[in-house]
Amino acid sequence: MRRIALLSAFVTIAAAFISCGGKSSEPTPAAKARAILLDPAAEKILVASHRADWRHHPENSIPAIESVIKMGVDIVEIDVAMTSDGVLVLSHDSTVDRCTNGSGPVSSFTLDSLKQLRLKGTHGEIMDSLAIPTLEEALTVCKDKILVNVDHGWNYFPQVLEIARKVDCVDQIIFKSGGTRQATAEAMKQCGETGIIFMPIVTVAKDGTSETIDSYLDGGEMPVMFEVCFSKDSTAIDTYMKALTDAGSKIWVNSIWGSLCGDNDDERAYKSPEDADLYYGRLLSLGFKAFQTDRPEYLIGYLRKKGLHD
């Protein structure tokens, strides 16, 4: 009987394996990152790379995205704009002037005409083989590998959702936007019905106050995560961050510029590695569980030494 039971169990497992096309049930990197994001008790820090790996490749380009995936980055932040024929493409600016060999608003180009332009590299050199990618092209590269923060994209929610569904990566998408508590509640409902994660952006003023954060702490459903910006570090930041995390939300910091993180930024940590704990360590002490960075490789190395990143 025991042998029959073991054989039956083996057949069940084998059938499950075959029904999945012979693929392992091991969670994908994107699924692992999403699970960490959704778990308030998770200690691992999520690393989000700002405009992908723009230090080594054109920002918002396919090679830049592929580079941060190889690094082990958890979230890639990309920016979207729409062409004149209604196609979402990756562009931080409303014009193509800074990042390509062309000029004019993105919205004045059809996709075909935009694809004739060539992206500029880190030092302004023209990249003969690289054009602005579409959002669909970018999400296809990201599928199963990395979460995607679609910045400048909230006004295009239906279009982003349609593309994400086509690529089958809806649960990898993160939206963020500023606005009132009521606007956030409506956005959370809209995103929650699809599986997309919505993250409100809140700011602590130089005087240490934030009416927006206060409105969240007054009650109601809390978002999974807040993006918190603060130009001046103070004990008020400690108070607010503790209140948000005690309420069950995670918090995201932008270490890309000092004006967004009380001068605890990437460049200070990178240029003075012996003092990295003064900067990154301070942000960790505040309870931040996601860092948007311009130094993804350096930050990952710092976090791994502390056992805070896989």
Identify the residue ranges that each predicted region occupies.
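Phosphate-group recognition and catalysis centered on beta-loop-alpha active-site segments
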Residues: C20-D310
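Bacterial Sec-dependent N-terminal signal peptides
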Residues: M1-A31
